Amino acid sequence: MKNLCIKARAPSRIGIGGGGSDLPSFFDSYGGAVLNVAINLFSYTKMWRTETGKTHITSHDWEIERDIEDLGLEFELNKKDNVDMVRAVMKSASLSPKDGYEMVIHSMSPKNAGLAGSSALIVSLLGAMFNIAGKPMMNRDTFAKTAYDIERQMLKRPGGYQDQYAAVFGGFNFIEFGKEINIYPLRLEEDLVSEWHSSMMLFETPFPRKIFAHEVERKKDDEVKKGGKSIEYLKKIKEYAYGMRNSLVRGDVKNLGELLHLSWLEKKKLPGVSSNDIDLLYDTAKQNGAYGGKLCGAGGGGFLFVVCDIADRKKISNALAKKGARFVNFDYDFEGMVSWRTNL
């Protein structure tokens, strides 16, 4: 045990369709459905035991290097050195900082990218902590629900369910929400996987979110609870997700892209999602051959997802580069969360 090192990783995700309908405030009354795919922008955890009587956390992309000695939550979401996430996962895994741990965490997904990097990190942390504690790993469905409870209940960060499921299961997934949550992994043939990989593009926009993702989600949640027009928008977004699922399994790139476009027109009506600059960038992608696209995650900035024919990839990439957007290469991840043991 002295030289034992635990590592874990979990993938980020691209929410293809249905985003927002996975909010409990919506699906409890109207049902929800989302289509997403896990990608190889991973969140990593490395941890090992020490004899210091405290837990030391290092994360260069979070700009964190701190000791913690208790599990008290600070609830200061905007602090650069926020470690509530680590504390909440330790509490869920029944670990104590005073047991003595060294922990290094790293996320390949930039903060506020809309790719669910924070959810992936929670899943990665949870996998590593269960491993180091020698606890039997939960089944994947229970694992995803536990990660959801940590992020949404313990940390009180608003949002839906899909992020945790993508990070735990990996691959393409269609998830229905209602009285129960049912996840349907979509097992595509190798040719279809290649077709979709050549037809999907991801861009980092030059527009950072002016507000944090959890604030966008909170506004959306508040609108739904008020019973306003957001409910009608989300109903349409949910229905488009079913059509996108059917297009995905058929390999119908154009139809999925067109449904993605219609879904985006509804999503941008939600509070805090789009802006004039984002609309201009999206229109540029469409003018250069994109069938459709959307901002990833809650919106307000971050990453732009585009579906197109393979012949138009370069034209779209060049046009968006002139607008300051950076093409981000990615691959699909079909493993989901994995944790393993090695020596220090």
Spans of model-derived segments:
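Hydrophobic alpha-helical hairpins/lids featuring a short glycine-rich hinge
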Residues: 92, 104-106
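Glycine-rich active-site/cofactor-binding loop and its immediate structural neighborhood
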Residues: 301
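DPxDG-like acidic metal-binding loop motif
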Residues: 114-136, 168
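Short pre-catalytic strand/loop immediately N-terminal to key active-site residues, enriched for Gly-Thr
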Residues: 109-113, 291
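Residues at or immediately flanking beta-strands
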Residues: 100-102
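A generic structural signal for short coil/turn motifs at secondary-structure boundaries
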Residues: 112-115, 268-270
